[in-house]
Structures are given as C-alpha cells and as structure tokens.
C-alpha cells in the first residue's frame, strides 16, 4: 500500500510539472511597442512649434497608439514618425 501511495504521489507530481506553462517572454512578436507610422513624413509632420505634433496626434487618432515620436536620421536627413503603443511620452 505504501509503494502505491508513493507511486501515485510521484505520478501526480510529474503530471503537474509537465502541464506547467512555459516562461512568458517579455518581447513577444505579436505585440511591439514602437511601430513606424509610414515612410518619410517630412518636416511639417514633426514641427516642434506645434504641440502636440501631427505625428503624435495622428498616431493617437488614426493608429490607436498612446503617443508618437519623431526621429531624425542625420545621414539621410529623413524624418520618421514612430507610434508608441506602450507609453505616452
């Protein structure tokens, strides 16, 4: 009887261990925080004289993001708008 009890406990333990979910990765391909709005948006889209910028307004209005940020690339002099779905800066 004791052998059966030990066997049953070990069997249940292994079932629980095998059915435990795997670790959840912090970075998931299904959801990415920052996504490019689309191509070279130009200087008027990211004009710092207007707050909030058109980049931020359009990301919030049309893309459902929490915020938007402009990034200027020094070599090519292109301005890109990135929509942020995780935080509002």
From Swiss-Prot:
Checking SMART domains in the record gives: Knot1 (SM00505)
**Disulfide bond positions:** 33-86, 46-70, 55-81, 59-83
- The signal peptide annotation in the UniProt record is 1-26
**Gene Ontology MF terms:** sodium channel inhibitor activity
Name the InterPro entries for this protein.
Scorpion_toxin-like, Scorpion_toxin-like_sf, Scorpion_toxinL/defensin
The superkingdom listed in its UniProt entry is Eukaryota
Q: According to UniProt, where does the site described as Reactive bond lie? A: 49-50
Q: Which UniProt keywords apply?
A: Antimicrobial, Disulfide bond, Fungicide, Plant defense, Secreted, Signal
Q: According to its record, what are the GO cellular component terms?
A: extracellular region
According to its UniProt record, which protein family does this protein belong to? Answer: Belongs to the DEFL family. Protease inhibitor I18 (RTI/MTI-2) subfamily.
Q: What is the name of the protein in this document?
A: Defensin-like protein 197
Organism of this sequence: Arabidopsis thaliana (Mouse-ear cress)
Point out the gene that encodes the protein: ATTI6
């Amino acid at each position: 009887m004791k052998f059966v009890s030990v066997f049953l406990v070990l069997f249940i333990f292994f079932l629980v261990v095998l059915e435990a979910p795997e670790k959840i990765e912090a970075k998931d391909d299904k959801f990415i925080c920052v996504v490019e709005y689309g191509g070279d948006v130009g200087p008027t889209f990211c004009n710092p004289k207007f707050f909030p910028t058109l980049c931020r307004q359009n990301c919030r209005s049309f893309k459902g993001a929490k915020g938007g940020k402009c990034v200027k690339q020094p070599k090519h002099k292109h301005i890109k708008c990135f929509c942020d779905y995780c935080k509002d800066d």
